Every structure is written in structure tokens, then in C-alpha cells.
Amino acid sequence: MPDRNAVVTQELPIAATQTGFFGLYPAGDFRLIDGKCTDCGTIPSARWYFEHETIAVPAGGLAMAGYARRIATFDDVRAWHAGRSDDARPEYPPLVWVAAPQLVRHARLRADGASLDLAGTVLPIERVAKIPLNRSYYDASSTRFFASRPLTARGCLNANGRFVVRTLWPEDFHLRDVPPFRALPADFAPALALRQLMREEPNGGARSSFAAFTLWQKTSTVTDWRGRAVLAFIVNGGQGDDDEAHAGHFAIVTGRIADDGAIGDWLVNNFYTLDAESEKGIIAAPVPLDNYLADLNSGQAYYRPSYLLVAVLSRERATALVQAALGRVYNQFYRHQLVYYHPTTNCTSISVDTLRALGFDVPARGPTSRLLAWVGFPYFAAKERSADKAKLAFDYLTVDQTRLMPAAAIETIFGGLLSLSSGTATTESADRSLGQMLAQDLDALAFLRIPQIPSSRAWGDAPAVNAREYRARMPRDRSKVQIVPVPVRPFPARLRDDDLQPSSPHPSERAALAWGIVLLVGIPGLIAKAWKYLRASR
């Protein structure tokens, strides 16, 4: 038993780059800085967002993801992919938002939540402060949840020798052994089968235990997945106290299964609006899975349950390709060649568009209703007394659902992966496409359900899969709608490159123009005809 009166005298905690990985890449290949660095290759527009945050950047001499100028983002990805050789050097992310410079592993939280037991000693802790805009936080129920399990903690030692904890991650959320096989219902399409898994527990598994299942496995696959590369897709569920978040959140995850089955080092490619401050402190970036889910302020697991669809691969080439492509997308995103617009350029669409640009066919599910969008445009404008809100509604109704709804995207991706596994999918003819790589290298598909971490926040649920479900979760009394107002974060003009290409007009611009013509020409014409008719009838 550790000496509960002892204090840490050895070099604990350790630097976040001293052990483990960031996705596929050894953490030791990176160095820790903040965004004010002047000797790193990360572009200035990216560094600006992290001037007061700890980030990891590739060490000198390592190839970093780049970008092309005067070209649309996904045209850039397609052109880069077409010219990329099979033996290309790894292209490291331009940055990883590690959030905290130090970590400890295999720790236990004391029942009073005041210290961590590790390596035979005791490390006094305190928790990072709650962000003022954050409406809930870690509480006594969180301590009870963490006190029963081994933990990885990210944070930093302060001047008083206390470890200021930013992240607590349960190490028993792992893939140490191949998960038990879970047969899919034979009479269900893959999309519906996955939806059933996500919804089979109350609240979408928010209050349930961590669970992992094998959904498909190649017969020749070995039963030891340790060290295997993975390409995963994460969907976070709907929040219980934010009526803008019933559809959840989507991201692509890359990495490898650690020798002890750990998954916390996987890299989550999180896209989030850059032009507003997040009430939870979220900044769009590649981020370790443990911090993405379990940061005390921004961790998605504090707000809702989460689900991971994991493709276990025989080779890492598909994973490396996707991560390198996402590095280019991040560069274009930070410099505002790719601008966040929630209906059409969001966490889901950016991820799905990247997969499609690399040659993985994610079939479209179609829009919610083009007819309703066009016919309802003047109604929305009159009801909301805002043409801008009518445009927003139009764009939500006309975008393909796999580019808008996280649950629709992961369901469709699951179906696509199963088709690749059976040889029935349509892929690009070139062997170098992502679809062909996955068809050749896919060894298994696993499903992970990660519960919500108890805190003062309301329980979340499985994500809404379409607009009808989303509307059903909204309060009928509009005065009870919960929305968190956040301040804007304007992009500095000094960082805006002069080669940026104009964004394509939103689809709603055509609707606004068409209805404007109707109002300016059509209605006056009808009035004139009616007047002539009345005069003639006298």
C-alpha cells in the first residue's frame, strides 16, 4: 500500500512528450510549446488560437502537413493525394493541442478527491478552474466515478507542489483483449443495426458502463489487436441541457492500440467553429482522445455519451493517409480558406468531405426536404422576421444529411465499411484510393460505447439522426429553449492571406434571389392583373 503521508520526491509527473503517442506518431517526435513560438513551422494563423495553450509541434527535421494556395480546400486534398507516392514520408500534424504539459499514468484518486496515489507515493492535486461560461462542472459524483478505477491525469505542477489536473481519463476504457463478438440483426440494414446499438441502453448509455463489441472480423485475423493501426469515427450524443446540441458531434480518430490496450493516445481530429469562443473552451485541433473526452471543461464525456466505430487495420497506410490529409485541412481551416458555417461546413461535413476526397465512398443520404426549403422560405422569413434566419433554415433543409447529422454519417460509414469487407463496395479504380486501402487492410470492426462522466450537468442521450427527431427534442415552449450565448472571436486581418479564394455561395442565396424576384415582380404583377379584372367587371 502507498504511504498516505508521503509526498512525491521523484520526477513525477513527466512531460507529455516523454511517453506514449499522439495518434500514430511517437510523442517523443514532438516538442511542447505555446502558440507564441517563433521557431516552429506551424503557420501563424494556427498558432494565434493557441497563444495561451500548450501545444505539441513536430520536432525539427520532420515533415509536416502543408497546404496549397489559391485552391479550394478539398481540391487541394485531391491534388495532393493524386501526387503522393506510396513511400511518402509521414506528414505530421501542424500541431496537437495537448492542453497540459505533464501527465501521470496508472494513478488512483483518493476517495476525498484531494490527491492521487501513484508509484508508492501521494501526489496532492487541485482541479483546473471552471471556465466562467461553462454552466456545469466536476462535482462529488465525479470523484466517486473516478475513485474506483486506474487513471491517466494530464495537468501541471504548480509552485506549491500540487498537480493542477486538467484531464482525468479512466484507463479501464481500453481494448486490452479482443472484444466479444456481437452479432448484428440479420433483418436490419447496417445503419439501423448501428443505431440500435447506440440506443439500446437508457439515455444512450450515458449512465451505463463502458462497453466494447466486435461487429465484424476477417476469419484470418489474429486474435491479438495490440499494436494495430486504427481508423475510427466518434460520435458524441445529444446534450441534455443545450437545445443546439441534440444532434451530437462527429470526428475522425487515428492511432494504434497500445501494448496494454490503451486508447487514450489516439488522436481526435476535432473541427469546431473558430470565430466564436466556446463556452467549454474547445478549440478546433487534433487532440488526444483522453483529453477530447475527459478534459474537466471541454471533455465531451462530461456532456453526453459517446460512440466509437473502430476499423482495425493490418497496415497503417490508410490511417497515415487520412491523418496527413486532415493536417492539410486544418491548415486551410486555420487560415480561413475553409470557413465554418454550421449547415454546410461543420464537424461532420469537413470529416466526410475529407474521406470522399481521398476516395472512400460515403454514400449520400439526401437532404431533409428541398421542397419544404423552397416553399417555406418566405414563411421562415416572416416567422423569424429575418431573411438571414430563413437562409439558415433553407441550408439546413437542403444539405445532404451525411454532411450534417453525425449519427447519419457514422451509420453510413459503417455500411460502407461492411460493403468493403464483403467486396460489394464501389471504389476508385486506383489502388491508392482510401477505399481500396480499407478494402485490402480491414481486419475487424469494433464498437465502443463510452458513458457520460457524472458531474453537475444533466444527462445526455443518443444523438438525433434526422431533423424530425431533432425537432421532437426541442421544447414546445420557445421560452424554455436552452441556448448558450458565446462571444465572437474575429480573425485578425493581419493574419489573413491575400491568396484566399472566395467561398462558394450558400444554396440559400439562390432561394433569396428567386423569392426576391417573386416579391418584386410577381406580386406587383398579380396586383395589377387583379386591378384590371376589377375595373373590367364594373
Model regions: which residues?
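Solvent-exposed soluble domains appended to multi-pass membrane proteins
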Residues: 357, 361-363, 379-488
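Short, aromatic- and cysteine-enriched interfacial helices/patches
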Residues: 375, 527-535
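Gram-negative bacterial Sec-dependent N-terminal signal peptides
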Residues: 1, 535-538
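Sequence termini and other peripheral, non-core segments
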Residues: 159-160, 165, 521-522, 530-533
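Residues that flank catalytic or metal-binding motifs in active/ligand-binding sites
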Residues: 44, 247-250, 376
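Active-site nucleophile-His-acid catalytic modules used for acyl/amide transfer and hydrolysis
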Residues: 2-9, 13, 295-388
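Glycine-rich catalytic cores of cysteine/serine-nucleophile enzymes that process amide/ester linkages
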Residues: 189-193, 211-306, 425, 440, ...
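Long, charge-dense tracts
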Residues: 5-213
